[in-house]
Amino acid sequence: MHERYVPADVEAAAQSDWRAADAYRSKEDANRKKFYCVSMLPYPSGKLHMGHVRNYTINDVMYRYLRMNGYNTLMPMGWDAFGMPAENAAMANGVPPAQWTYENIAYMKKQMQSMGLAIDWSREVTTCKPDYYKWNQWLFLKMLEKGVAYKKTGTVNWDPVDQTVLANEQVIDGRGWRSGALVEKREIPMYYMRITQYADELLNDLDGLGWPERVKVMQHNWIGKSFGVNFGFPYELDGEKKLLRVFTTRADTIMGVTFCAIAAEHPLAARLARDKPALQAFIDECKRGGVAEADIATMEKKGVATGFSVSHPLTGEPVEVWIGNYVLMSYGEGAVMGVPAHDERDFAFAKKYGLPIRQVIAVEGETYSTDAWQEWYGDKTRAVCVNSGKYDGLAHDAAVDAIAAELKAGGLGDKQITYRLRDWGISRQRYWGTPIPIIHCPSCGDVPVPEQDLPVVLPEDLVPDGTGNPLAKSDAFLNCTCPKCGAAAKRETDTMDTFVDSAWYFSRYAAPDAQTMVDARTDYWMPMDQYIGGIEHAILHLLYSRFWAKVMRDLGLVAFGEPAKNLLTQGMVLNETFYREDAAGKKTWYNPADVTVSFDDKGRPVGAVLKSDGQPVELGGIEKMSKSKNNGVDPQMLIDHYGADTARLFTMFAAPPEQQLEWSGAGVDGASRFLRRVWAFGFANREALAVRAPFDAAQLAEADKTLRREIHGVLKQADFDYQRLQYNTVVSAAMKMLNAIEGAKGATPAVLRETYGVLLRVLYPVVPHVTFELWKALGYADEFGPLLDAPWPKVDEAALEQAEIELVLQVNGKVRGALKVAKDASREAIEAAAVADEMFAKFAEGRPAKKIIVVPGRLVNVVV
């Protein structure tokens, strides 16, 4: 054992032992409780960031603690390797996405290994490899057979210059990110998955999950189950009588309808735009906008009157039809009723275009005005109908029932349950993804690839150039034979949404070498006992993975219908930001490592200069670490300088796992100093710590009893904190233990050995390298086995018992000292001790005690 703690040497030695023992390979064992903990697999972007370090350390701590407690634990890892960033990097660097991806995986895997993570690498999954995505294709075909997957037209962003489809994030101010061309909306055939078929189950099953309430609410709102009325506004056009159908949850406001708005893609819009160039121009403008719901929600609401009216279904009054850029064809019926008096969006639209505003609900004590929107205008809990004829005086529910009944009687509508959730469109007009296993035959149409011909292998040597899909230009991939008739045919060139890849990877970890999609091992490990990832995945990834599990269950592949029992969403890692702004308002961001900050006398930052030129930079505040703000910390530099254990200790100590973590260089230094103290104590006391003499706890001297009482008391709290995932207070507990052990005067070697061994085991899940090496060097491994599987220390409840307790001594209600009495002292004995105490004599000044108040276990108050 070396005197000085050298992290690089300690960590290399520990990792060498773990590799030699294949320490983290997990096997199924029906006789043991299992614990399957998974971190969301990373995209191989090139390097780990501090968010990765935090996520994987949380997972690792959980794994090690539960393994010490006898669980059969598994922590796997893989790579979410398909996706657009690889294509962008390929275009920038002129290399195939496959090369860029595999090089990044190799580097990031090396970084993970340097962190000492307890990963079973024999289960590694890479989603861009054919042996994985074969099963994406296989399940897609099964879903196609069952009608869960199907084909229909969908709207995409089309770049007319690059001749390619753009993701929503590639459309900037209505233009393509590369070409700058005005983006068009196009309708193209796409494959969808019928997630709406599972909407109610996805909603109801949320109740049984140990997930953060915030995530459950987000999913609940995304699914968006609504109870309302679907009805039509009658109209006649070209000699045909039709209905303009809408859905509303506020049928009680139907008498306040003053206009209807339809989507630019609505069939009625195209018909009404004939011979109306201005109307057609507006439709074209709408189609150039983004297709994302978020874009629609934030953009300026605009509309154009069509000059056409439909009839109000209850009054027969004419209702003007507008085309609105905020109406989505993909939601509801592609049309909405406009009730400006009681819908905030409609109110703003009506004020902008001078449309009538008709109040039809009222709240007692409130006065309606069309001057400005007030929150109560949309209130349905207190509202009653007014200006609504026979419905006047009805509350929301009663009005909806009555109006729905009248619409139904007239054949115009009825009550309906709808969902905000839409079927999952999985077709992507991109190269780097799972090929959709469909063949297009001139005679047979769309033909599924036969199961025996899977996987349809994606060529890995293509380099995208930004003009269309490379697969459509690859004769070797594109041209094939129809499996039905043998004629020349073409392969489908769309690939699957990358959310397909991440929808089930955790099931493949359980059986990575299976010759089927999953096998019995999957039902042993799944569902995950703990899933860990960022809140940004609360909706899409987590919702799709839940849907995928239910589909696999219904196909008889697995026994579970939910992929994760418990979910932890770790907080973001934050850091200071610094910038300079030029005359044009453009900001240049500087990394905190390149800046010197000055502080006031209270430690608050008041200024900063760039180290390279000594000139001032602006303080931008604390924000999430990101490339855009240049405020990241390279984990590899941290590990190289301080060691992985210091990085792990700081990230666990600085904040509870679910809360944001503020980066602190001083905090990292403090973590490093603490580990040096742990090592230094072990080295300085190595001979005493080697003593394995048994002891009778009841016969120990007071110094030993005091140390054991403190250590076992802290151990009890640390064990509780491990169970509730509060790892920051676990580290605090370890620091208290070290302080107690270092400060113990007169403790015997045997008790020092016991208590230091407890400290090492409490710290081990957080800092496995240094504790593993100390455990081995000081002979603990010879007694208990390697720290990997050493049993978790048990609290000695007897050690917590105290012969004496300390009571607060008060004289006339003021604290004057402390009183030590036997734990089982009688009230009379406590009173006698109080009046005999020298502090009582000092403050009583010779006056006798009139009354003595004893609060058992807490205080004694003598009134004079």
Curated annotation (Swiss-Prot):
A motif ('HIGH' region) lies at residues 42-52. A motif ('KMSKS' region) lies at residues 624-628. It is found in: Cytoplasm. One of its GO terms (biological process) is leucyl-tRNA aminoacylation. It comes from Burkholderia pseudomallei (strain 668). Its EC number is 6.1.1.4. Its main location: cytoplasm. InterPro entries: aa-tRNA-synth_I_CS, aa-tRNA-synth_Ia, Leu-tRNA-ligase, Leu_tRNA-synth_edit, M/V/L/I-tRNA-synth_anticd-bd, Methionyl/Leucyl_tRNA_Synth, Rossmann-like_a/b/a_fold, tRNAsynth_Ia_anticodon-bd. ATP binds at residue 627. GO terms for molecular function: aminoacyl-tRNA deacylase activity; ATP binding; leucine-tRNA ligase activity. Gene3D superfamilies: 2.20.28.290, 3.10.20.590, HUPs, Isoleucyl-tRNA Synthetase, Domain 1, Valyl/Leucyl/Isoleucyl-tRNA synthetase, editing domain. It is an enzyme of class 6 (ligase). It comes from the Bacteria. Belongs to the class-I aminoacyl-tRNA synthetase family. Keywords: Aminoacyl-tRNA synthetase, ATP-binding, Cytoplasm, Ligase, Nucleotide-binding, Protein biosynthesis. It catalyses: tRNA(Leu) + L-leucine + ATP = L-leucyl-tRNA(Leu) + AMP + diphosphate. This is Leucine--tRNA ligase. It holds the Pfam family tRNA-synt_1g.
